[in-house]
């Protein structure tokens, strides 16, 4: 057991925690990452159906630019496992409403890139290991935490005590650090789970995403780097998700194809499936003393727009910019003014996206015929109006 002093401690070494550390590295401050899980093994390998990570993220062009600035994107590019997509088709399964987005609507090369979560994590780990002022402590749980006037003191499962000038909570939606800091949240349960898997399709996906809004919840088909493989995210009410996670292979494939109703490619084969609960949670405050929240620890949303990880990366970039700016000018880089600027910039965007997801959930979950009619008219109207369509595309790819 020992006492360790660092400038900045980050609890949680997932994508957002690692990106936050890298965004702060230019300060030269001593930054230590702590994660309860063992260090992940090498990123995904192989191209067979079950070799692909079932958890993927739809990284926007803005997130990709940020990862490039952290020297983390090159490993993803070299792996040739990122699936860039240029088109997105969204439709209402209960009517005729649909929107077709294309990259040309924004005069860009692609709307984003589908990347396995484990690959993004591995790329960021490699980047942190190349930075002399970053250290990572894997398999180290947070046990207790005290927020003091000039520091944050916490103990870990190894028995060590860490004293940090500031601490960042990046440990996910069920954040232990947020709980120990006594920070309040507002939480909504959707009563749904998401089933994720990799599927083989025919014909090839042609670098397009498909999203069907079903009465039971949205189904997304996301193109992977191999042109005959897609990742699925199927959000279903609790009882239905329990049924479909246990369904045999052929029944599940048939269920997917019925849900897609011929709008997307035909699903031929499905990998092993995983399921996780859907919860929306938002911290009332993003900081308390010298403790700050980022990513899902501050806000977690429904995955239907694929924006969760992009919002978290925006948190990491904004907090990093504010601290680096203050440090370069010799100001107090862990002052309430710095943290307040971060919160002010990020809270509005995060709340706006959460409200949009809640509206989509209500609008497409309603069985009221009048609501069904209005949403179909709305979808078709947006598809026919270039300015409105451009705005929706900008929201989908996180463009300003």
Please identify what each model-predicted range represents.
Residues 321-400:
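C-terminal helical "tail/cap" subdomain of flavin- and related membrane-associated enzymes
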Residues 25-52:
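Glycine-rich FAD pyrophosphate-binding loop
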Residues 242-334:
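FAD/FMN-dependent oxidoreductases across multiple families
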Residues 51-93:
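N-terminal FAD cofactor-binding segment of flavoenzymes
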Residues 6-33:
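N-terminal Rossmann-like FAD-binding beta1-loop-alpha1 element of flavoenzymes
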Residues 67, 151-273:
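Conserved FAD-binding catalytic core of PHBH/FMO-like flavoproteins
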């Amino acid at each position: 057991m020992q006492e360790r002093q660092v400038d900045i401690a980050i609890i949680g070494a997932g994508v957002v925690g690692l990106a936050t550390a890298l965004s702060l590295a230019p300060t030269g401050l001593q930054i230590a990452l702590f994660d309860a899980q063992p260090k992940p093994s090498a990123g995904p390998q192989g191209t067979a159906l079950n070799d692909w990570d079932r958890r993927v993220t739809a990284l926007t062009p803005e997130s990709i630019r940020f990862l490039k600035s952290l020297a983390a994107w090159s490993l993803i590019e070299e792996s040739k496992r990122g699936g860039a997509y240029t088109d997105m088709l969204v439709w209402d399964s209960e009517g005729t409403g649909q929107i077709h987005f294309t990259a040309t609507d924004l005069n860009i090369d692609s709307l984003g890139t589908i990347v396995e979560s484990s690959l993004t994590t591995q790329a960021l780990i490699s980047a942190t290991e190349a930075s002399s002022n970053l250290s990572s402590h894997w398999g180290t749980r947070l046990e207790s935490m005290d927020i003091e006037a000039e520091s944050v003191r916490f103990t870990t499962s190894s028995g060590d005590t860490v004293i940090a000038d500031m601490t960042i909570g990046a440990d996910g939606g069920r954040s232990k650090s947020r709980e120990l800091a006594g920070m309040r949240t507002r939480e909504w349960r959707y009563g749904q789970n998401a089933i994720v898997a990799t599927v083989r399709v025919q014909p090839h996906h042609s670098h397009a995403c498909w999203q069907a809004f079903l009465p039971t919840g949205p189904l997304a088909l996301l193109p992977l780097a191999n042109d005959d493989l897609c990742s699925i995210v199927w959000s279903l009410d609790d009882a239905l998700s329990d049924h479909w996670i246990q369904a045999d292979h052929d029944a599940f494939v048939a269920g997917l194809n019925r849900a897609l109703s011929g709008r997307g490619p035909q699903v031929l084969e499905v990998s092993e499936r995983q399921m996780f609960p859907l919860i929306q949670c938002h911290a009332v405050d993003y900081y308390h003393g010298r403790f700050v929240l980022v990513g899902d620890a501050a806000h977690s949303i429904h995955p239907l727009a694929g924006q969760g990880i992009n919002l978290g990366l925006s948190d990491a970039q904004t907090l990093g910019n504010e601290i680096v700016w203050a440090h370069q000018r010799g100001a107090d880089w862990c002052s309430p003014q710095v943290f307040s600027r971060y919160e002010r910039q990020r809270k509005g965007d995060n709340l706006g996206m959460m409200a949009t997801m809640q509206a989509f959930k209500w609008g497409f979950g309603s069985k009221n015929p009048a609501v069904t009619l209005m949403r179909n008219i709305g979808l078709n109207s947006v598809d026919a109006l270039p300015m409105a369509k451009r705005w929706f595309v900008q929201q989908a790819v996180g463009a300003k």
